[in-house]
A protein has these predicted regions:
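Helix-loop-helix module between adjacent transmembrane segments
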Residues: 85-90, 124, 128-133
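Alpha-helical solenoid scaffolds in large eukaryotic transport, assembly, and signaling factors
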Residues: 1-71, 88-92
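A conserved hydrophobic secondary-structure block that centers on an alpha-helix together
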Residues: 112-125, 136-137
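Short inter-helical turns and helix N-cap capping residues of alpha-solenoid HEAT/ARM repeat scaffolds
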Residues: 2, 6, 37-38, 76-77, ...
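Outer-membrane beta-barrel transmembrane domain signature of Gram-negative proteins
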Residues: 67, 78-79
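HEAT/HEAT-like alpha-solenoid repeats
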Residues: 23-33, 58-73, 96-111, 137-147
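Short helix-coil transition sites and intra-membrane helix breaks within transmembrane domains
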Residues: 56-57, 78, 92-95, 134
Length: 147
């Protein structure tokens, strides 16, 4: 199946999920789209993951998402970094917050030309989303060491 077809079918899954139908399949295709280098596929995958996944989803999918998001948060491309942080802010699961907190804190506190203002704003919004959803995570030493 071509990447165009995968992207098209994932958009159909997103649409059916938004309409309220049970779409508990196709998450692995969305994760494979996140791994693509083409921006269209990556955007589609991140939107699908952000909308369709929650705490009750398959843990194996979260492991794949964490690895891909770690790569995107440290790649240096501001669009990919912003996509990853937007999705993290929307999902906000405790496991994702614990795993990716150091990278997000680093991005929010970095004040060099290597980290544009847009990326720092996304990082701060992601941290705010984590704070609103799980206040108990901010008591852990990982967060305190970052600040």
């Amino acid at each position: 199946m071509s990447t165009y077809d995968r992207r098209k079918y994932v958009w159909k899954l997103i649409y059916s999920h938004i309409l309220g139908y049970d779409a508990d399949f196709g998450h692995d295709v969305a994760v494979s789209l996140i791994n693509c280098f083409n921006l269209k596929e990556k955007v589609t995958g991140y939107i699908a993951i952000g909308i369709m996944l929650n705490e009750r989803s398959d843990p194996n999918i979260f492991v794949n998402c964490i690895e891909t998001m770690k790569q995107d948060l440290t790649c240096g491309n501001e669009v990919r970094e912003a996509l990853a942080m937007s999705t993290l802010g929307n999902m906000g699961t405790p496991s994702l917050a614990r795993e990716l907190a150091p990278a997000i804190i680093h991005k929010s506190l970095q004040q060099t030309k290597a980290c544009p203002l847009y990326v720092r704003k996304k990082a701060c919004m992601c941290l705010l989303s984590f704070l609103k959803r799980q206040k108990q995570i901010f008591d852990e030493p990982v967060w305190i060491e970052g600040f």
